[in-house]
Amino acid sequence: MQTVHTRAALAAALDPWRRAGERIALVPTMGNLHAGHLALVRRARAEADRVVATIFVNPLQFDRPEDLAAYPRTLEADAAALAGAGVDLLFAPAEQEVYPRGRDGVTRVEVPGLGDELEGAHRPGHFIGVATVVCKLFAMTRPDVAVFGEKDFQQLLIIRTMNADLDLGVRVLSEPTVREPDGLAMSSRNGYLGPEDRARAPALHAALRALAGALERGERDFPALEQAARSQIEAAGLRPEYVSLRRRQDLDLPGPGDRELVILAAAWCGPARLIDNLPVDLPPSG
């Protein structure tokens, strides 16, 4: 695996692959990798001739400077994991390389509506930062395919919408959430959990499963089911921010005829803010 740190070196590495007509897949990350990231690499490996991974802790998507400063930087271990998973090229730029005019002056990309609620309401500006950096990474690498995880479901839809609206031409694929044996969604932020909080954390996924089970049994009072899930999360010692049942295709509120839904939730577990989601297919009525 080759590692490059500048846009010029990235372009030089990509050029012969493009001239040879090879398909290129992109896996963007912020590092501090876990098994979920490596699942994205495996999918990319199956979809393309060459796999490019990026590691960039994007300052535009952090709400608080202290969170940006505290985010783990584990480049050496991450590079070894990516090489072992079959990545051909790692792009690990400094902030100045991605935002040469500085983060304050950069042109920003916004997906209105979809980026304003749920995670967007609790983390103002977060999705503008995500869309901006992904748009720049797409422009710098010009991949045929990019792979993202479904754990960040709202982010996935925002990236797909941006890609379509701006005619970027990238095939955006997704991989299911990878979980610990007790159901906790794998996340770089799980490292913030102490032993007691780690023991409580699976309650978030358990509440989503309970809500999904109620839907599959035919219950349809969505607000009451959401409140029951919030109460279950609180009873486990977590602090829920939201539990919301949405239409899977666009995160609109579901109507009577909608069957492909997703439950989205966020909760604080000690110092860690956890997010999770669970797709649900309602049985046909009648």
Swiss-Prot record:
One GO process term, biological-process aspect: pantothenate biosynthetic process
Similarity section: Belongs to the pantothenate synthetase family.
Predominant place of localization: cytoplasm
Binding residues annotated for (R)-pantoate, in chain numbering: Q61, Q155
Record keywords, A-Z: ATP-binding, Cytoplasm, Ligase, Nucleotide-binding, Pantothenate biosynthesis
Pathway noted in the entry: Cofactor biosynthesis; (R)-pantothenate biosynthesis; (R)-pantothenate from (R)-pantoate and beta-alanine: step 1/1
Subunit record text: Homodimer.
EC number: 6.3.2.1
HAMAP family in the cross-refs: PanC
Signal peptide, first to last residue: none
GO molecular function terms attached to this record: ATP binding; pantoate-beta-alanine ligase activity
Record: active site: H37
GO cellular component, one term: cytosol
UniProt catalytic activity: (R)-pantoate + beta-alanine + ATP = (R)-pantothenate + AMP + diphosphate + H(+)
Name of the protein in question: Pantothenate synthetase
